[in-house]
């Protein structure tokens, strides 16, 4: 993660031929720049402290809950644990160092930390984002291949190793292209003596812009696409499963109403061999017929071998009219007219409706939770990436007076994702929620 002054000084460092003019003209701008957040520094300190503590404690609880159930390892829980660990690193590396640089207007941690800390900040944020992609891919695989789901702990280890390798590889240019700059040499003022700033020093602007665009693609656009595709697939599968469940319950209701008429309607009909054959036929082919507007009529007796040849095609009409005039409802060939449930089927129908309502409520809950996951990621990280892109292409669009304030707002929104990830991936996860509740009770006692 870049420091807030990088874009401002990259242009100054690239114009070394005009150093004298820069010293005379930029010093008043530095004073104006320095006073941009002085009125809000206590508010920023309190806000950063609150966000950091909330993110640290929430992710620490997730780690403790997952460590408690180590005997029930799953790939998703393993990834959620690594997500909590990477979010803790984001809180530890990004919040204190960034806030200190913003409020004190200098880098106080030495030359070595100037090369290491931006690299660690970038790696922690990138790893957290790549783990979100991994969780989305695993969920997509579990939905598309529920029966052949053979993801083991080794697959989780492989995913985590790949994620950390990609994080180190993508962020590897940052230690090379960061340098410590003395402000007295840059601005030519004795008031800025012994003050240093850690800034990016790319060979040219094109390198810096290329790196910013790469981070935008890997840290924002790619995760957003993966989360959207995966969670859309999950919601669609749940919706299809709900539809199949509802259809199956309605079909069972139709057959139960047909096979078990009300006791008030008369004596039970004893099924003959042909009726049993017709019942097995409707069970086998019940999905071909309409669920709510289908009933069954009595099946004709199967003709014997002796009079089979006597049944001529012209007699089919009379047989059909004879069947349609019957008033008994026993298993047979379905026809399309509305069936009215008997009184003794009210309890069964009520159970069916309650089951379908419960499944619909659960599916809506999953849909809302997955939608919130996508929105939280999109809203929290979009301002910071837009800020870096805008300042890299044209740093004059944001005035020096409001530069640090805008950066702090964007940076705090990004940090909020570290506070919300434990809630979205941990506290709303039914498998982890019970362990979290028991853990909180133990800590409270």
Swiss-Prot record:
Per the annotation, which location comes first and is thus the protein's main one? membrane
Pfam entry (one)? 7tm_1
- Residues carrying a glycan: 10, 17
Give the record's keywords alphabetically.
Cell membrane, Disulfide bond, G-protein coupled receptor, Glycoprotein, Lipoprotein, Membrane, Palmitate, Receptor, Transducer, Transmembrane, Transmembrane helix
**Which GO terms of type biological process are on file?**
cardiac left ventricle morphogenesis; chemical synaptic transmission; eating behavior; G protein-coupled receptor signaling pathway; generation of ovulation cycle rhythm; negative regulation of acute inflammatory response to antigenic stimulus; negative regulation of apoptotic process; negative regulation of glutamate secretion
Q: Name the Gene3D superfamilies for this protein.
A: Rhodopsin 7-helix transmembrane proteins
All disulfide bonds of the chain are 114-198
The membrane-topology field of this record reads: Multi-pass membrane protein
Q: Which family does it belong to?
A: Belongs to the G-protein coupled receptor 1 family.
What is this protein's function? Receptor for neuropeptide Y and peptide YY. The activity of this receptor is mediated by G proteins that inhibit adenylate cyclase activity. Seems to be associated with food intake. Could be involved in feeding disorders.
Please identify the protein, giving its name as recorded: Neuropeptide Y receptor type 5
